[in-house]
């Protein structure tokens, strides 16, 4: 950390510690913080890191604001073990070995797939909706993909430009409400 802490980002900022990130988030209790744990070399390392993350969140009384996400099934299981009340999202970009929605439901975590996976395997969304596993599509940065997500009943989308996507969805809702008197789009 000593080396990273000396790096100055554009705007004169530095990379915050996890504690600093959580303390900033604590200032707005209505904000959900999504913490992504990257995959590590061994499950043992992931377990230790998850334990430290959950311990710090508990110490700062932040668990109620947290959602956890990872590309590692093991890390997701550890988050569920140590913070079972928190939403845990398994992320995948594998077209050929996506985690089974039934397994995710049994494990208690939700699923997030890349646009590439969902667009090539839309039946995954159908199965997730059928058994009550939330679906998240990433990364959605253009209106055409938003339209596709709405058409295919994706539950959530993740974007590098959430303000633009929200504005687009708001415009769709306005048009749909004017047309039908109600609208039930992506939450």
Regions found by a protein language model. Name each.
Residues 1-87, 91, 95, 107-109, ...:
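Metal-dependent phosphodiesterase/phospholipase catalytic core, i.e.
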């Amino acid at each position: 950390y000593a080396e990273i802490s000396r790096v100055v980002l554009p705007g004169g900022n530095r990379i915050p510690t996890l504690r600093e990130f959580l303390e900033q988030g604590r200032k707005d209790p209505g904000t959900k913080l999504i913490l992504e744990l990257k995959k590590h070399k061994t499950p043992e390392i992931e377990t230790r890191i998850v334990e430290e993350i959950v311990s710090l969140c508990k110490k700062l009384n932040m668990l109620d604001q947290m959602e956890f996400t990872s590309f590692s099934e093991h890390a997701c299981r550890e988050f569920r073990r140590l913070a079972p009340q928190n939403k845990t999202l398994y992320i995948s970009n594998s077209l050929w070995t996506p985690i089974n929605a039934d397994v995710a439901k049994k494990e208690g975590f939700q699923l997030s797939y890349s646009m590439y996976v969902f667009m090539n395997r839309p039946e995954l969304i159908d199965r997730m909706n059928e058994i009550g596993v939330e679906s998240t599509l990433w990364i959605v940065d253009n209106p055409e993909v938003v339209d596709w997500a709405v058409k295919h009943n994706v539950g959530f989308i993740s974007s590098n430009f959430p303000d633009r996507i929200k504005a687009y969805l708001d415009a769709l809702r306005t048009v749909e409400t004017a047309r039908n008197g109600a609208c039930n789009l992506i939450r």
